[in-house]
């Protein structure tokens, strides 16, 4: 049974912007009239703690589906970013998905750093933030740039499309099972260990709580390591390679001992997990939410179209006998029927020939000049038989009972039936 799609109501925002959220953004923007407006290609050098706002574009263009705006704040000293409005302020979010995205971003965003980069969509609500120094205020630089095509967004979008279209195939592939299990063991060891120990956890509620905790802990550790990846690679290259090799081999061995998914329920669970994950990737891989909704609707419709076509094919197969006549069975003629039809066809053709010869436009003299027996032809046109008594007698002797042709056929059959010496 297909699961219900009621969760789309909770996770997807409405296509139109909510009035309450728009009113809140306007009030927040009015409360900070002293904030400086940022534009693309701006480069601001200052030593005063101030706030800045980037006004989003109201007109959406499909050519900027994967474009992002990047604001970089650099200083010799430590800085802190405080969001005033925008999607990073989690007090007035429009949906559960927006709230989770906001909390996740604020949880993993660096609180204090010498260089802070803010990446957001050029469409949507106005983003306002203030720059707060940590300790003594030093000069800092605020630069604004726009990526026409953010390859990270495009890669996330393409990955989501691929996972959605090939979720069923991947869920049944042993290669995908082993490779994804190995990668999961390397990147998220806690989640991998919990999945391997699932049989020893009796309650699903306990397993779900542990899975959520392990998932967020693993993602948090992974994001923290990704920020310092260059430093870790240059200073601890051998340790990183050793960890990848050892944990990768252990993860592959655990997956190999467990074996690929055999029962249909586990495969369906993996397939639906991949599809839900792919929808989340498609939604986050597009800058404008309207384009994301359109792509999600097309994907869901294309997936449902397969089942509609199957139902239509089944109904057509069931209703086909009502509209299709039974095919006629061919029957061979007997010898008597064949002889009767041959005689009737011959008589009809001869009569048509007589009528054609009796027409005024028939070239009678030309026909007579080319015939060997003009008298016989004239008698035939006047109604006599087309065969003379001598011809009938010769035919009976040749093909009748006791004729030469019949005897030849009988002797040839007897010769073929004799065994070869």
UniProtKB/Swiss-Prot annotation:
In the ovary, highly expressed in somatic cells. GO terms for cellular component: nuclear inner membrane. The chain crosses the membrane at residues 64-84, 147-167, 175-195, 206-226, 238-258, 281-301. Keywords: Membrane, Nucleus, Signal, Transmembrane, Transmembrane helix. Residues 1-22 form the signal peptide. The keyword Membrane applies. It is found in: Nucleus inner membrane. It is a multi-pass membrane protein. Its main location: nucleus. Belongs to the NEMP family. This is Nuclear envelope integral membrane protein 2. It comes from Mus musculus. The lineage of its organism: Eukaryota, Metazoa, Chordata, Craniata, Vertebrata. The gene is Nemp2.
């Amino acid at each position: 049974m297909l699961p219900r799609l009621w969760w789309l109501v909770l996770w997807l925002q409405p296509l139109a912007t909510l009035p309450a959220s728009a009113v809140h953004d306007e009030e927040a923007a009015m409360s900070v009239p002293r904030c400086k407006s940022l534009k693309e290609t701006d480069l601001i050098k200052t030593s005063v703690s101030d706030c800045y706002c980037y006004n989003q574009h109201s007109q959406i263009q499909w050519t900027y589906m994967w474009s992002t705006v990047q604001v970089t704040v650099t200083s010799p000293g430590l800085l802190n970013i405080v969001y005033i409005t925008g999607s990073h302020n989690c007090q007035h979010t429009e949906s559960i998905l927006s709230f989770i995205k906001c909390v996740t971003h604020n949880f993993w965003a660096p609180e204090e750093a010498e260089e802070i980069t803010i990446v957001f969509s050029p469409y949507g609500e106005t983003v306002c933030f203030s720059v707060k120094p940590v300790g003594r205020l030093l000069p800092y630089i605020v630069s604004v740039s726009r990526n026409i095509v953010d390859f990270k967004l495009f890669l996330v979008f393409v990955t989501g499309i691929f996972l959605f279209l090939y979720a069923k195939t991947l869920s049944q592939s042993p290669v995908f099972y082993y490779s994804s299990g190995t990668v999961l063991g390397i990147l998220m060891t806690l989640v991998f260990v919990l999945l391997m120990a699932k049989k020893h956890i009796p309650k699903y509620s306990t397993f779900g709580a542990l899975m959520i905790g392990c998932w967020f802990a693993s993602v948090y550790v992974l994001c923290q390591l990704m920020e310092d990846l260059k430093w870790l690679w240059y200073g601890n290259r051998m340790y990183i390679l050793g960890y990848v090799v050892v944990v990768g081999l252990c993860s592959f061995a655990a997956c190999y001992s467990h074996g690929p998914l055999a029962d249909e329920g586990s495969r369906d669970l993996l397939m639906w997990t991949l599809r839900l994950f792919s929808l989340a990737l498609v939604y986050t891989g597009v800058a404008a939410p309207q384009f994301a909704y359109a792509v999600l609707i097309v994907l869901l419709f294309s997936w449902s179209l397969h089942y509609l076509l199957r139902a239509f094919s089944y109904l057509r197969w069931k209703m086909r006998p009502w509209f299709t006549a039974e095919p006629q069975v061919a029957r061979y003629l007997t010898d008597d029927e064949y002889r009767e039809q041959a005689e009737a066809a011959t008589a009809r053709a001869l009569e048509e020939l007589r009528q054609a010869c009796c027409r005024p436009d028939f070239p009678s003299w030309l026909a007579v000049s080319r015939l060997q027996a003009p008298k016989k032809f004239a008698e035939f046109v006047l109604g006599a038989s087309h065969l003379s008594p001598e011809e009938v007698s010769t035919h009976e002797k040749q093909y009748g009972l006791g004729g030469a042709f019949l005897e030849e056929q009988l002797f040839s059959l007897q010769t073929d039936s004799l065994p070869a010496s």
